[in-house]
Amino acid sequence: MGKEKTHINIVVIGHVDSGKSTTTGHLIYKCGGIDKRTIEKFEKEAAEMGKGSFKYAWVLDKLKAERERGITIDISLWKFETSKYYVTIIDAPGHRDFIKNMITGTSQADCAVLIVAAGVGEFEAGISKNGQTREHALLAYTLGVKQLIVGVNKMDSTEPPYSQKRYEEIVKEVSTYIKKIGYNPDTVAFVPISGWNGDNMLEPSANMPWFKGWKVTRKDGNASGTTLLEALDCILPPTRPTDKPLRLPLQDVYKIGGIGTVPVGRVETGVLKPGMVVTFAPVNVTTEVKSVEMHHEALSEALPGDNVGFNVKNVSVKDVRRGNVAGDSKNDPPMEAAGFTAQVIILNHPGQISAGYAPVPDCHTAHIACKFAELKEKIDRRSGKKLEDGPKFLKSGDAAIVDMVPGKPMCVESFSDYPPLGRFAVRDMRQTVAVGVIKAVDKKAAGAGKVTKSAQKAQKAK
């Protein structure tokens, strides 16, 4: 095997008909984890249904359908390789819960790939005031996805086909537009592609001799290339937060005969090791970690991104639950939040939101009603500048600083300290009505919580 490639996560955004599925399908198809047999099966089905021209998107549709039905499909299907990276597509919009997934998401995307369609009239539709493209790009930026690649797709359907003029016009528009959101266009690779025909996807296109390649300038090193695959190869690798204190939000807690209580979750920051004494917030239970395992193999340490189960002593299944957060009892242990201040963006709420609104935000794995206790100020959503003090209400499109109070004990952190525990989505009326980033947390000084015997022993021994 040699040295493993670095894993990176991307999120693909863009308007409904921009050709996201075809483009993504093409990459997975050509560089991915789908075996020949599956592809032949898909091609045959697509042809039988008269969808021959749709085979790449068909791949993605099949995968999506399985995802929606909750079949845990072979996740390798959502992966592909570049020369430097293993790339996982963590989500593509169009999926009902896209926005929620992007926020509570199993992982933070390292880069967003924005697909815009170059076809006559298509680009204009996708980027119009109420186009989803704006929303998705703004979300990506707000949630800390600071790298962006733009694929100008369907170059084969411009007037005339492969028109340089049309491409340049679009690059100009998109640059203005992403700049308003906060991205610096100089750091963004723009690539003219056809996800369907394969132009500039993996190989330079003979149809666009005028395209001299893309260039990005950034302080961590400049890069240039011709294809979309090369642009993905030039993503700056993420630094995984191993140096921060441990934070592990629980997804489930199992009781396993002969072993005992096994909380399961994903290490978001820090390192989890057997022998560590961990504290669970907000329940304030402290105990020793006996063992840590992933895919049924014992680990000597679990790092950020690892989904693990760990065995804890003298703790019953009733003591800890989904939404609790485990941390190192000696290094900034997690605590209950009495309240928190957040910057929220209202996405689509039919009415007005005023103080007292109490929706149920999804923050990491917690799902607890929180009251908008005070609307402190309305702000400009790009610059963050204050527009108005103490607004009476908020409506769609507004950004604001609000004080929130959880209805039941919960543990959250500020976005700057622990990003995955500091962003949330507010779902209401079957849609995401707002997203938020936590600015500050009012932590409740914990009283004497439950400290198990094994934790006391482990602490004495040290």
UniProtKB/Swiss-Prot annotation:
The modification N6-methyllysine is found at residues 36, 165. The modification N,N,N-trimethylglycine is found at residue 2. Residues 153-156 are annotated as: G4. Residues 91-94 are annotated as: G3. Disulfide bonds: none annotated. GTP binds at residues 14-21, 153-156, 194-196. Residues 70-74 are annotated as: G2. GO terms for biological process: cellular response to epidermal growth factor stimulus; translation; translational elongation. Pfam families: GTP-eEF1A_C, GTP_EFTU, GTP_EFTU_D2. The keyword NADP does not apply. The modification N6-succinyllysine is found at residue 392. Residues 14-21 are annotated as: G1. InterPro entries: EFTu-like_2 (IPR004161), G_TR_CS (IPR031157), GTP-eEF1A_C (IPR054696), P-loop_NTPase (IPR027417), T_Tr_GTP-bd_dom (IPR000795), TRAFAC_GTPase_members (IPR050100), Transl_B-barrel_sf (IPR009000), Transl_elong_EF1A/Init_IF2_C (IPR009001). Belongs to the TRAFAC class translation factor GTPase superfamily. Classic translation factor GTPase family. EF-Tu/EF-1A subfamily. This is Elongation factor 1-alpha 1. It comes from Equus caballus (Horse). The gene is EEF1A1.
